[in-house]
Amino acid sequence: MRRRPLCTSASRVTASLLLSFLAVSSAAELPILPAPPISPQPHSSEKDFSLRHIFHHGTYKYPELHRRLDVPENAAVWAAEHLHSEHREPVPRLRVKAEPMSIQRLADRSKEAIDGILEWGRMKGRAVQLAEDDWTIDEIAGPNVTDRETVLSFARMASNAYILEPNTGEWEDVGGGFNYTEDFGWESDGLRGHIFADTENSTVVIGLKGTSPAMFDGSETTTKDKENDNLFFSCCCGQGGQFLWRQVCDCQTSAYTCNSTCLVTALREKNRYYYAAQDLYHNVTALYPHAEIWMAGHSLGGAVSSFLSLTFGHPAVTFEAVPEAMPASRLGLPVPPGHEIGSLQKRKMTGGYHFGHTADPIYMGQCNQATSVCTFGGYALQSVCHTGKKCVYDTVKDLGWRVGIGTHKIVEVIKDVIEKYDAPPICEPYINCTDCYTWKYFESNGTETTTTSTSKPTSTSKSSKSNTRTRTETCKTPGWWGCLDETTTGTQTSTSTPKHTSTSSTSTCKTPGWFGCKGRQRRANHNNNKVLAHNYPRPSTHRNNNILFLPNINFFMSVPRLVRRLSRRRRPSLPNKTEVVNSSANHFVYVLHA
């Protein structure tokens, strides 16, 4: 190849040198550009999980109990509807797809920092105001809730019970050295956590399951469950609603009006399930300090999983969870600046996904009607708002289901809902939601007392057999069938010996209901009017002045079946001078005139 001859012209050489100097000087003045960002390592799109540990933390009967059972790698694990179920199935493959997600959480999530924030909120009844610098938005690997198999795996991890083969592992006490080996029934009290880890121990799922609450009082634990749930999930401690709701405080001042100062004082009692879950969480993070934590849970366990998710900033996938936005606010969980305190349902980037179907009254916030099983059990579940995003299967429209508590169990949800649909529902935030919208809350100085005054007219002779009750003050709680204020009979007097005397009294109804005041009432003697109970069981304590209501409901009978049975039933033959004063699907009330 022929080489190009060198340039010998002085002018050309000078021009070339000048251009070279200019290029070098210009490059020196230019700013040094940063290196292009290194693309983040792609999150593993598929993870296989297996059961590694089972934690059990006591709540009421054994509050200091905390045990751990390690599951061997090749142990045979079976799934069942409950611990004593005869029907068992081998646990299928737990495969989960992951995807990048953004989550807003506290920058300092240490135990000491979180405990200080929660203690302040517990004493004040509201979340502490934190600066914007205290929060961070992190991109982490989260579950892909658009994948059907991922949703199924989370539902199985939130299942009721996992049973190991006999003689597989032993329970060990986690700290404290408390020995409950000889105590019977410790497994039925408390919160149980099933710990799943992937093959690389990079992601851990905590599946929480609370002990199934009994519907009717039979033990101290059941009563404590009702007190705990009615404090956090009802509008005002179970007051101002159904007759059978268990009342756990006296903060209602009038109809749909609640003293928030009184309510905060009642809420200072720690939520046993939430604090037990925190202790369980810290033990899991100690075992897996570098792993990303995901949460799963069903029903009450789903609500507690959501509490942990909002507190420590982890993704959560729950199933048929009790609406938890209102109790999360009452726990004083922290919220980022710019968010209205008490409206956690409007908070974004929480990482929470709540799956459920429209036929479940607990998930939909409808298990508070007069004929609901929750009401019969004394539970006042009035909260309706979820945090994060709701993922709703419309089983009422798509499958023709009727609303009922029987569709709440996780086994039915897996087999009859998730596996029946070809794809999971779309998860959307439900921000146009308000808890207890008919209620008014006010703050006070905490020194108010409720008093009841009675008038005592002078008397010159004995009262007669028939008494007429009149009120001397304005009715504070009007109802459908008259005033619902509780009446306390004053001293019966008369100025002579007439046939009828009048009794004046004043009252304050603490707990209004549909058919009268729920408080204890003193009945006057009514000899002229007698209530006839015609071949019916002994009535309950539900009395309303001169009328005795006779419940005739099978608690476990469906409403349509009840209506059909009542429509076929003939009313009993009655004596003369008998008046039917009220008849409904729930009661037959007759009054026999003397």
From Swiss-Prot:
Binds to both phosphatidylinositol (PI) and phosphatidylinositol 3,5-bisphosphate (PIP2). It comes from the Eukaryota. It catalyses: a triacylglycerol + H2O = a diacylglycerol + a fatty acid + H(+). Residues 34-594 are lumenal. One of its GO terms (cellular component) is multivesicular body membrane. Residues 1-12 are cytoplasmic. Glycans are attached at N144, N179, N201, N259, N283, N432, N445, N576, N582. The keyword NADP does not apply. One of its GO terms (molecular function) is phospholipase activity. The chain crosses the membrane at residues 13-33. Its EC number is 3.1.1.3. Lipase which is essential for lysis of subvacuolar cytoplasm to vacuole targeted bodies and intravacuolar autophagic bodies. Involved in the lysis of intravacuolar multivesicular body (MVB) vesicles. The intravacuolar membrane disintegration by ATG15 is critical to life span extension. Gene3D superfamilies: alpha/beta hydrolase. This is Putative lipase ATG15-1.
